[in-house]
């Protein structure tokens, strides 16, 4: 969750300092954040069944 907060703050800083017309960096960071988020979701989907096998309720 920390990477998400850092990327959000960095994106806001770049959006304010660069402006809307030159916000290429913001788009790149948004794509990176989306890719990281999707990778994290996929990782949780893979790990959850293994966790249930190791630590049953």
Curated annotation (Swiss-Prot):
* Function of the protein: Male-specific peptide with moderate activity against Gram-positive bacteria.
Q: Name one GO biological process term.
A: male-specific antibacterial humoral response
Out of the domains of life, which is the source? Eukaryota
Regarding protein family, the annotation reads: Belongs to the andropin family.
Q: Which UniProt keywords apply?
A: Antibiotic, Antimicrobial, Immunity, Innate immunity, Secreted, Signal
Q: In which tissues is this gene expressed? A: Ejaculatory duct of adult males.
Give the protein name, as stated in the record. Answer: Andropin
Q: Where is the signal peptide?
A: 1-23
Q: What organism, scientifically named, is this protein from?
A: Drosophila yakuba
Per the entry, what induces it? In response to mating.
